[in-house]
């Protein structure tokens, strides 16, 4: 904890600036030697020359944060140099030569945690904000970083501590009967607390599934336009398009964002009877992808009459029993597909879309509207979020213990035992872990300079 550490806080690569962070008792002294300047007012920005052994390295913006008013709670210095990775490495090496050591992954955040600048829920939120790929969850993470999850947990903890104190008082006067109004009040209190915890847990589990991305399989007979549809949605030539049947022999997967939701597009091999062994394997993978997907795009060629392969596809869609968008492709050509017959054979709820892939942007817009209609409408503006398995496990244990406490209301010793166990589980959400090994494991997932 007393070491002075340094690291490059920005991604390696060329850009406008790179940031080098220094934290520890020697941070200010190192900055003075780097800049050959002695006076720094905390929280003021200075433009300074940066030297190493008397050799000029760069002109940079530097800021000194005096302990405890910094991210880590220690003296912190930031050097914002020009964004050349070689230059940033040279300045970092100069810091190391002056007595700093290279920071471990997540060590700045670990210092902030150990110095009580952030709790576990805020630490979790900070790393998830960096990793998050879902725009709709950013607000919930920002609110968690602000400390709203901590406030929620601490309020619940305070409520349970009051119940525990009341129970302990009654235990001390065990010769008297437990007041019935006390039991009713405590039971109602616990029910509300359990419900609020379950709401948080259910929302977090739903969000976790959503973060994996909605799997969308594109299926159809050969040459129906599946690969063209994929390319249109990606606005690039990702899949090979050919008039030769069986061109796509394996599944192709790409990730896009539609209206703040991550979508995994899976282009599949054309479904038909084939004597080609490799193509048959591709078709088997196509059918397998339908079992694991969330939404199906069933592609039909509007310019051709329905044939056996189309009816096989309809049977496949009916068996899959998944949300389905029936895409009638190639509507720029004269329509020959018997639409009413197609509709009569579909036995599942579906949405219908006529389009063509020649106009990629229009096609993408039409599909986005249809696909997004299947997305769950989640209110993340007013929701808190659990971001790790450890947090979810702790809350699940708290719920379990509260339910046990409620079941043992008339046996105060057991009630108090389960209530205390629930409080201890809540502590794991915001309060320090007990072993340094667990801390090291948690912060090792962070990046350098964080």
UniProtKB/Swiss-Prot annotation:
Q: Coding gene?
A: mnmE
Q: Can you name this protein?
A: tRNA modification GTPase MnmE
Might you give the EC number(s) for this enzyme?
A: 3.6.-.-
| EC class | hydrolase
Entry-linked InterPro entries: G_TrmE (IPR031168), GTP-bd (IPR006073), GTP-bd_TrmE_N (IPR018948), GTPase_MnmE (IPR004520), MnmE_dom2 (IPR027368), MnmE_helical (IPR025867), P-loop_NTPase (IPR027417), Small_GTP-bd (IPR005225)
* Biological classification of the source: Bacteria, Pseudomonadati, Campylobacterota, Epsilonproteobacteria, Campylobacterales
Question: Which organism does this record belong to?
Answer: Helicobacter pylori (strain Shi470)
Q: Name one GO molecular function term.
A: metal ion binding
Q: Which family does it belong to?
A: Belongs to the TRAFAC class TrmE-Era-EngA-EngB-Septin-like GTPase superfamily. TrmE GTPase family.
| GO BP, sorted A to Z | tRNA methylation; tRNA wobble uridine modification
């Amino acid at each position: 904890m007393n070491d002075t550490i340094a690291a490059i806080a920005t991604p390696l690569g060329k850009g406008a600036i790179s940031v080098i962070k220094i934290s520890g008792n020697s941070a200010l002294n190192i900055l003075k030697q780097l800049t050959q300047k002695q006076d720094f007012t905390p929280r003021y920005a200075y433009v300074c020359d940066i030297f190493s052994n008397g050799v000029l390295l760069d002109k940079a913006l530097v800021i000194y944060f005096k302990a405890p008013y910094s991210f880590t709670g220690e003296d912190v210095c930031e050097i914002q140099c020009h964004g050349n990775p070689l230059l940033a490495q040279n300045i970092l090496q100069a810091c190391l030569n002056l007595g700093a050591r290279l920071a471990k992954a997540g060590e700045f955040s670990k210092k902030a945690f150990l110095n009580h600048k952030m709790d576990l829920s805020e630490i979790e939120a900070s790393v998830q904000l960096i990793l998050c790929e879902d725009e709709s969850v950013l607000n919930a993470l920002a609110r968690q970083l602000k400390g709203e999850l901590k406030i929620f947990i601490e309020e619940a903890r305070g409520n349970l501590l009051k119940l525990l104190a009341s129970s302990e008082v009654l235990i001390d006067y065990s010769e008297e009967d437990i007041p019935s109004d006390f039991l009713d009040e405590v039971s109602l209190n616990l029910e509300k607390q359990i419900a609020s915890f379950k709401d948080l847990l259910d929302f977090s589990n739903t969000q976790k599934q959503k973060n994996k991305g909605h799997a969308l399989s594109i299926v159809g007979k050969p040459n129906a336009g599946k690969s063209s549809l994929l390319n249109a949605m990606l606005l690039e030539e990702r899949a090979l398009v050919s008039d030769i049947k069986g061109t796509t022999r394996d599944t192709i997967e790409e990730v896009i964002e539609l209206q703040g939701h991550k979508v995994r597009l899976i282009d599949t091999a054309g479904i038909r009877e084939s004597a080609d062994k490799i193509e048959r394997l591709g078709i088997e993978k196509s059918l397998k992808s339908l079992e694991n997907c969330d939404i199906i795009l069933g592609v039909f060629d509007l310019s051709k009459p329905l044939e056996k392969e189309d009816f096989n596809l309809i049977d496949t869609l009916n068996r899959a029993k998944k949300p389905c968008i029936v895409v009638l492709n190639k509507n720029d050509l004269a329509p020959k597909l018997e639409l009413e017959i197609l509709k009569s054979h579909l036995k599942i709820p579906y949405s219908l879309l006529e389009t063509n892939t020649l106009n990629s942007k229009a096609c993408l817009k039409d599909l986005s509207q249809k696909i997004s209609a299947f997305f769950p409408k989640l209110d993340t503006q007013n929701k808190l979020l659990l971001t790790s398995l450890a947090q979810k496990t702790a809350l699940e244990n708290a719920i379990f213990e509260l339910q046990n406490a409620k079941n043992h209301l008339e046996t105060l010793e057991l009630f108090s035992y389960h209530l205390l166990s629930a409080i201890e589980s809540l502590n794991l959400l915001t309060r320090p872990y007990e072993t340094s090994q667990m801390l090291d494991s948690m912060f090792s997932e962070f990046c350098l300079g964080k």
